[in-house]
Regions:
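Contiguous ligand/interfacial binding patches
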Residues: 122-125
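Signature for HUH/AEP ssDNA processing cores
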Residues: 1-91, 101-105, 114-116, 128, ...
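Histidine-centered, metal-coordinating catalytic motifs and their short helical/loop contexts
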Residues: 94
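Short beta-alpha junctions and helix-cap segments that line functional grooves
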Residues: 108-110
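Short edge beta-strand segments in beta-sheet-rich domains
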Residues: 118-120
Length: 168
């Protein structure tokens, strides 16, 4: 991407603080942060997991059951209680809660997968207002703010129990 386009992307983020600082922090997960900025101009950037953060992949069915809702507002309300960033991927019917690195070493909840070192995740640019394709369901409030694994595990457990009860 040329410098003028990159500058335009940064200007759009500056209008939504602390989005630019969060974008810089996320981009620093990559060996070449400039390539992340280039990718964001086109769509989500592919970032390595395990350095700055891991991601817990949760099915949409599990999240919707935990929220006891399928409406945008009901699901967002539940996910915002994780107090950290959550990406929605409607193409794959999944959510990704960003959690501290090395969560993979202690994650014991079998109903959602924790992705870490060696895995990559499509991450949209912060403050992007779209619901087409991967997008932030809950924005990162400040650089380095992550969901607590215990809170995510509780959400997954509630969703799993509700799905199991509904199937019986």
């Amino acid at each position: 991407m040329n410098a003028q386009l990159r500058a335009a992307l940064r200007v759009s983020l500056v209008a939504k603080p602390p989005a630019e600082a969060c974008a810089d922090w996320l981009a620093s997960a990559h060996d070449r942060p400039i390539t992340v900025w280039d990718a964001w101009y086109e769509g989500p950037a592919i970032l390595p997991l395990g350095r700055l953060f891991d991601a817990i992949r949760i099915t949409a069915d599990t999240v919707h059951a935990a929220a006891d809702a399928t409406t945008h507002g009901g699901v967002t309300d539940l996910l915002s209680r994780l107090h950290g960033p959550v990406i929605s991927d409607p193409w794959r019917n999944r959510y990704y809660a960003l959690v501290p690195p090395q969560t993979t070493e202690t994650w014991r909840t079998g109903y959602a997968q924790c992705l870490g070192r060696g895995a990559w995740l499509g991450v949209p640019v912060p403050a992007l207002d779209t619901q087409h394709g991967p997008h932030w369901r809950v924005q990162m409030p400040w650089p380095g703010a992550l969901c607590q694994p215990r809170d995510v595990a509780d959400l997954v457990q509630v969703g799993h129990l509700r799905l199991t009860a509904a199937a019986q």
